[in-house]
């Protein structure tokens, strides 16, 4: 193959990959239109990895929070839902400020729910906290998407997928009545 053909070949491969990703992305948005779908959203960008040891739920100043980029990203998540004609139903969130802020900025409404707080090192406590979350997903059979705004550990425990901040997994109810991941999306 000549050197002059390489840039053209690279461009063709890139365009094919982009078209495939766009098609997959539209399939996930389409899955959101199905009655009983569930969105499991990891909070928008918040610098760092964990809350400080002295963090308190009643004081956002003691927690890891969204920065300007994270707040803008949360707004873009909500805008992407609106652009795709998706009106969400109930929005439940971890009581951590970065999750509550993501939910408010994206969807304008939020109900704090302690079961979504995640990042607990005690495996048994994590399992017990996830039981009502799994039940809420199982009970969501119809209507607009249920949104769960949470942390990476909860997304992973619930879906088996690792997602970056600002990404979400769409769970769609199958013919057997169980929810399964239809895919994940990330809004820059």
Question: Where do the protein language model's features map onto the residues?
Answer:
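Bacterial N-terminal signal peptides that target proteins for export
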Residues: 1-9
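Generic beta-sheet signal
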Residues: 36-38, 142-150
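A short, structured loop/turn motif at beta-sheet edges
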Residues: 139-144, 174-175
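Bacterial N-terminal signal peptides
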Residues: 8-17
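All-alpha RGS (Regulator of G-protein Signaling) helical domain and cognate RGS-like helical scaffolds
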Residues: 116-126, 130-138
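Active-site-proximal alpha-helix that buttresses catalytic centers in soluble enzyme cores
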Residues: 25-114, 119-122, 161-179, 184-188
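Sec/Tat signal peptide C-region and signal peptidase I cleavage site
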Residues: 18-24
């Amino acid at each position: 193959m000549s050197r002059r053909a390489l840039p053209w070949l690279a461009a063709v491969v890139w365009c094919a990959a982009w078209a495939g990703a766009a098609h997959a992305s539209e399939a996930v948005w389409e899955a959101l239109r199905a009655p009983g779908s569930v969105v499991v959203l990891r909070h928008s960008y918040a610098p760092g990895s964990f809350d400080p040891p002295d963090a308190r739920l009643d004081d956002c100043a003691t927690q890891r929070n969204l920065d300007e980029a994270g707040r803008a990203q949360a707004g873009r998540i909500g805008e992407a839902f609106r652009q795709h004609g998706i009106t969400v139903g109930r929005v439940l969130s971890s009581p951590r400020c970065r999750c509550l802020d993501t939910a408010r900025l994206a969807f304008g409404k939020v109900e704090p729910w302690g079961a979504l707080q995640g990042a607990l090192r005690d495996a048994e406590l994590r399992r017990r906290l996830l039981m009502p979350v799994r039940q809420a997903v199982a009970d969501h059979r119809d209507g607009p998407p249920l949104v769960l705004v949470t942390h990476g550990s909860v997304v992973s425990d619930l879906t088996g997928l690792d997602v970056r901040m600002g990404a979400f997994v769409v769970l769609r109810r199958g013919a057997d009545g169980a929810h399964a991941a239809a895919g994940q999306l990330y809004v820059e």
